[in-house]
């Protein structure tokens, strides 16, 4: 059966779900997305990825700064949609908006709830060393990711997965699971699962200062940091007084006798640095104003400063 849907989403993560709805038998009446904002070095006003897709498909676009406004709420109710699908929208939905739809507001969340409620579930899962994460389809309520769940689908986190890798994989899983959930919801063929509050954890928003590498942490922890903060904000250390971004790194040993931050060796395999415990090998680096380069290229340019046994980073 075809449902009348209002879609709310903003970043690239929401795009596969919107595309899936457009390609389905359902009808997307309107797309809500955050207002256009300055972005990049030039601070050029940019449309959200979701807005671009909506415009290309000639779907009405609505960009309120807030949904707390009574006029905006009445506009939403007047659409007489069956359900609202929310994917990383970024604005709070007040009670009146949550109650405006026959089948409620359904959210696609990038974790296995109740673990990692909040803004940064993908990054927090990697930082914590979780072996798996996934997608939860949730019936929204007034709490922060506290609603009853319609469905869940797990996804393994490999030792090499970056936040970018997981983001892309989970966005596709979310699109498929959302369509399956809508079909069951419409038929009444779905059993809602309440979240276990005792197991809940919170994925707070990533702060830029978290990206600074503390070499006294273990190599395992720092490697997770590098993976979790790729593609943003990018883990970094200091080299010759300049911030140096680390795009890719691997653990080569979980024990070491070297002091944290000391250069162990530098060769074509990478630049190996001692951590609080273990050794981290840097593979891709970037200095300010420069392109991302391989460890080999970095050694060619700065090899005279890379002296084993010396503290060169941090």
From Swiss-Prot:
Enzyme class name: transferase
UniProtKB keywords: Protein biosynthesis, Transferase
UniProt cross-references to Pfam families, sorted A to Z: Formyl_trans_C, Formyl_trans_N
InterPro entries reported in the protein's UniProt record: Fmt (IPR005794), Formyl_trans_C (IPR005793), Formyl_trans_C_sf (IPR037022), Formyl_transf_N (IPR002376), Formyl_transf_N_sf (IPR036477), Formyl_transferase-like_C_sf (IPR011034), GART_AS (IPR001555), Met-tRNA-FMT_C (IPR044135)
Transferase is among the record's keywords: yes
Catalytic reaction equation(s): L-methionyl-tRNA(fMet) + (6R)-10-formyltetrahydrofolate = N-formyl-L-methionyl-tRNA(fMet) + (6S)-5,6,7,8-tetrahydrofolate + H(+)
GO cellular component: cytosol
Molecular function, one GO term: methionyl-tRNA formyltransferase activity
Enzyme Commission numbers on file: 2.1.2.9
Chain sites annotated for binding (6S)-5,6,7,8-tetrahydrofolate: 111-114
Biological role stated in the UniProt entry: Attaches a formyl group to the free amino group of methionyl-tRNA(fMet). The formyl group appears to play a dual role in the initiator identity of N-formylmethionyl-tRNA by promoting its recognition by IF2 and preventing the misappropriation of this tRNA by the elongation apparatus.
Entry similarity comment: Belongs to the Fmt family.
Protein name, entry field: Methionyl-tRNA formyltransferase
Organism: Coxiella burnetii (strain CbuK_Q154) (Coxiella burnetii (strain Q154))
Species lineage: Bacteria, Pseudomonadati, Pseudomonadota, Gammaproteobacteria, Legionellales
